[in-house]
Amino acid sequence: MTSQSLRDQAATFGLTTEEYDLFVSQLGREPNALEAAIVGAMWSEHCGYKNSRPLFRAFPTTGPQVLQGPGENAGVVDIGDGWGVAFKMESHNHPSAVEPVQGAATGVGGILRDIFAMGARPFAVLDSLRFGNPDSPRTRFLVNGVVDGIAHYGNAIGVPTVGGEVTFHPSYQENPLVNVMALGLLRHEDLATGTMGEVGNQIVYVGSKTGRDGLGGAVFSSADLSAASQADRPAVQVGDPFMEKLLLEATLEAIQAGLVAGVQDMGAAGLVSSTCEMAYRASLGITMDLDKVPTREEGMVPMELCLSESQERMILVPVPGKEQALHDLLAKWELDVVTIGEVEAHDRYRLTWKGEVVCDLPVALLNEAPKYTREGVESADIRAARERDLSGVPLPGDLGAVLLELLSHPTIASKRPIFERYDHQVMTNTVVVPGAADAAVLRVKGSPMGVAATSDCNPRFVQLDPYAGAAAAVAEAARNLACVGATPLAITDNLNFGNPHRPEVYYQLQQAVQGIADACRALNTPVTGGNVSLYNQYTEGDHKVAIHPTPTIGMVGVLPDVTVRASLNLKAAGQTLLLLGHRAEKGWSDSIGASQYLETVHGLEAGQVPPVDLDLAQKVVDGTLALIRAGLTDTAHDCAEGGLAVALAEMAIAGGLGLNVSLDAPASVRADALLFGEAHSRVIVAVEDAAAAGAKLDELGLPYAVLGETVEAPKVTIAAPAQHVHLSVNLESLKTAWEEPLKGILG
């Protein structure tokens, strides 16, 4: 192939013609087709973060709790007593849109490899899923496929799926989001990194044989979805959880035996990405012999060997002098183990095939993709929606019926039909089962501690105000951890956005990153890593439809004593309900802006996103933790989608008890805003000793309100005298509305 024809075909490699010219200029000669394909993969958004990395400078990434920050396979935080938690979230959006079962399954497999590549034993998975219209046959196909894929891989490998979130909105109709978060435990001394070490070190391929599945996956995930994407099924990998289990055990045994100097998962862009990233971290060069790569298909050529994304494969670099011991250990697990190359004292990435050099590129060139800082401009339509006057929105006549309607919305309704497909008790570390509390809680065996994890984002907030919406996602994650008794430690993020070449999309990305950064600083939760998934949009007629911007936040925290925790279910009649974060000087929730209620009942996505007071957010976290750790409450629940009334109903449904609540809001507050508005930094707790709880909150300077009490009668009663509201709905009706919707979608 001539140099001109390569330039003409730059787009097939994932490069613009300008990027191709830059590549040639930096290389100082014309590349061959393999070299162009390798650079295309490494400069893709999926691998090179060329539209997003310049924004990451805003993130706080350090702190005394951070053992490993961004740049490795996963972040690691210190939880005390010599223990660390490795955690990370990644997306498998495009593959899941094309082949939902394998797309989701391999998403689980890939994130688990990132965790055990750090020397940590995976012990939990959470998934954050976004789908389109729940009544659509395509949505039902995608939901069932994705859930089956996650269940298949997680259940088979023996790692519990312990939590997550599921959202339904038309913007995800053709482009679902599958974000998977994994956590693993490790001793500090077992922390591993992805480096080549020193000159002379061997490069060892271990795991499954290489096939043609996943070819072009990195480039496929860095472009818009279209009707032609359905033909890209070969770009979707095929997973084998039983092979991954062998690879997991072998890798951890090798690390703990002190045989490994460096370890890296083969993920996006396969063999190339994993090895050139390791070389770049070490500031060294490598030479590899592609003839030695184990294959499962006949006639594979260098481009396929380099860019295949076949699953369950790792690169290990032995400690010098322990090469044979490593080979013997890995062979015991019946894995393919082959030395395919060596670390050398130069700066080149060299590949040979049949005795000839077929690739010779600077390591830095591969790893330093061009970076773009684009101009972001807010969409005029979105600004108009945010500034819309909502005073004319009619007040529903039957607010009890509205509560039932909100509880039956698939985004709010019970996710039991989903999580009951997952084995959430395998490994026997799960202390709080999915749906029982605002975050997952896992025990650390041999220690009194527990680890909590959550994933959160309200895409509607981010659509209307990306800065406030992203900051709100961080604050909500922190509240959710506090509601189980965990101190928030750090986050991983999964930034899902549309095409960054569109100014209105780049604006959303810019603003969301800044919102995350500011919230993380305020709440002392550094960013330890994450994932960016752009080009999440599809064509509908003559229009490009982007997803709602979805910066999903995965957050971990620690419980000093896992037996001192809280859940959301009401536990006894006669307890007092307190609303933490209620600001008497500012009144009750006084807006229906950006609420699930406004969208569901009135068909509007409009209005101001409730402002995020980060000082109050920290006080609510501190106050919730203080009450739980003082033994003053074991019941706590965050107010989120659906507002105060939905949160109270969820607590009653979970506990099988009723409640009587009276809200003393002034007459100027709309009844629907009072019940269903989504003001931030609010947590409901149930306490036996209201005086002691109040004294503790006063000591902390945290505002609160007394809502009412729990009762035996199976009925939720909410009165608001100034609004002439007296809502009373029996528990059975609430429970039916909440439990049934997803049963009709799954099956």
UniProtKB/Swiss-Prot annotation:
Main localization (coarse): cytoplasm
Catalytic reaction list: N(2)-formyl-N(1)-(5-phospho-beta-D-ribosyl)glycinamide + L-glutamine + ATP + H2O = 2-formamido-N(1)-(5-O-phospho-beta-D-ribosyl)acetamidine + L-glutamate + ADP + phosphate + H(+)
Binding site for ATP: Y49, K88, D493, G530
Record carries keyword Cytoplasm: yes
Subcellular location: Cytoplasm
Binding site residues for Mg(2+) 2: D114, D265
Name of the protein: Phosphoribosylformylglycinamidine synthase subunit PurL
Species of the source: Deinococcus radiodurans (strain ATCC 13939 / DSM 20539 / JCM 16871 / CCUG 27074 / LMG 4051 / NBRC 15346 / NCIMB 9279 / VKM B-1422 / R1)
